[in-house]
Amino acid sequence: MPVNQICIAFSTKAARQEFPMSDFLQTGPAISNTFTSDKLLQSLLQRFIPAQHWQQVQTDLERPGARAAGDLLRFADDAEQNPPWHRPFSPWGERLDEIVTAPGWQSLNDASAEEGFVASGYERRYGEFSRLYQFAGIYLFHPSSAFYTCPLAMTDGAARLIECHGDEDLKTRVLPRLISRDPASF
């Protein structure tokens, strides 16, 4: 049978009944804890982070790794399905210029603050290895972030710039908000 006749045959109602799509259901990938399942990351971190910090770093990274496979993934799905949009005017013509975000996007913001994805690099909990710890957390978060890691990178860049070159007003007024773990002020 020529190829064009095969294509026509499969497009007929009889062919669709004989080969229904409901017989082919592919399950999506199951994501597990992004830290405990990434042996290479663990090996690299253990190589560079001193032994006195390693156990605590390992414990601290298991939490965001688990969240990346759970609630953060659900928040990201909502954020992806409902991208931010610009509302220029109210229904009465008043100028608003608001960016409207979905609950998932807002939850990603809150979780980012709670997990300290920016703050951990500035708290210096692990001394000179704090930035490495910070970047590992962001690495674990990124696949479940709906690219929320992009504004986090900009926030981190602004925080570092203010920390190194900002005047006292910026360091007092702005920096604490950029590196806050409190979602209400982050």
What is each model feature region?
Residues W105-F186:
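Glycine-rich flavin
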